[in-house]
Amino acid sequence: MKRYATLSLLLGAAWLGAADAADPAGSGAEPAIVYSDAALPTHTIYRPARLMDRYPVVLWGNGSCVNSNFGYREFLAEVASHGFIVLAIGPHRDSPAPREQRPADPADWPPFETHYSQMQDALEWIAAENGRQGSPFLGKVAVEKVAVMGHSCGGLQAVRASVDPRVTTTVVLNSGMMADDDQYMRRHELERSILGEMHAPIAYFIGGESDIAYPNAENDWQALQQLDLAAINANLDVGHGATYQMPNGGPFARGPLAWLQWQLQDDAQARAMFVGAACGLCAGSDWTLRRHFPQ
């Protein structure tokens, strides 16, 4: 818990960026645009500039549960450019506000800036837009293909939102649960038993042993072995902050993007990143991959 508290103090300062920084477009075949809609002012939309197909939805939660996705814009635009509609908590182009020193005990912290229910709010909005005459999303949303995904504190938001029956897969980045009596867990309205309530495949992408969330993710992995649920745990030695701010999300983006492409787009090449003895994240890569695929 103390490790996550330390992270919360650091991220706001680390992700302050130039207000005039150009929005990235990603490297995929469908360059992304980034904006907010007046009807969903609490979120930023990352999506292909030209909506030529039906696109899966990715719901995003930020590290420290801050109300800003500014530090993830390279990564999220990269995801969108490969054919996804990403709805990220936080208004467009807002940088995290500087923070004062928090008390050591999370019981004394002010409330989180954001809540897992904002993922559900975004899903309700995009589903309505899919059927609204005059909407750019009319008939363009694959509402049956939905991922919840987040970094660190946002990863816990994704776990909490994952029991929604509309969720197709959960992606946990540099995160993992604590003990039930941990104040951090209570603030997320989380208990470890939620793993047993999950109904869809789950993927953990962690930054190696130097990642402050590594022990938490390991505990979750052990629990997942007992469940009839497809799951992976993939580590790349990049630490807790990973490479989200690098162009197109850097090398860490490769794993989560492939998982989304497999789970939500039925992409055979993406599947090969995780399945088989010679899989893309297996031996010979910089990743360490563990898999639990019940028959």
Please name every model-derived segment:
Residues 8-14:
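Bacterial N-terminal signal peptides
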Residues 19-47, 279-282, 290-295:
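A domain-start/cap signature at the N-terminus of enzymes
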Residues 36-141:
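Serine-hydrolase catalytic machinery in alpha/beta-hydrolase-like enzymes
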Residues 60-64, 152, 175, 207:
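Glycine-rich His-Gly loop
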Residues 124-197:
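Primarily recognizes the serine-hydrolase "nucleophile elbow" in alpha/beta-hydrolase
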Residues 168-246:
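The feature captures the conserved acid-bearing segment of alpha/beta-hydrolase catalytic domains
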Residues 237-241, 246-295:
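Alpha/beta-hydrolase-fold serine-hydrolase catalytic core, especially in secreted/extracellular enzymes
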